[in-house]
């Protein structure tokens, strides 16, 4: 699924985007943001972040710099290593 989404975004970037020109109000552009979000967070969460970004990309939003949030590791108690002596 991840590679399919990346392929679709790459197709858009190389085949469609040059025809319509730069229109994104953000840096990085929405397609680059979504591509990076999928690479960092996976298809489900990255796709969600990309969709939220696309919904904010409209003439009434000021835009600006909006990086992909860093991945936060969520470790449950069962995966934590026990400290020696405890």
From Swiss-Prot:
Pfam families reported in the protein's UniProt record: YidD
InterPro entries: Membr_insert_effic_factor_YidD (IPR002696)
Bilayer disposition of the protein: Peripheral membrane protein
UniProt keyword annotations, A-Z: Cell inner membrane, Cell membrane, Membrane
Localization per record: Cell inner membrane
GO cellular component terms given for this protein: plasma membrane
Family named by the database record: Belongs to the UPF0161 family.
Protein's job: Could be involved in insertion of integral membrane proteins into the membrane.
Record's protein name: Putative membrane protein insertion efficiency factor
The organism of origin for this protein: Pseudomonas aeruginosa (strain ATCC 15692 / DSM 22644 / CIP 104116 / JCM 14847 / LMG 12228 / 1C / PRS 101 / PAO1)
Lineage: Bacteria, Pseudomonadati, Pseudomonadota, Gammaproteobacteria, Pseudomonadales
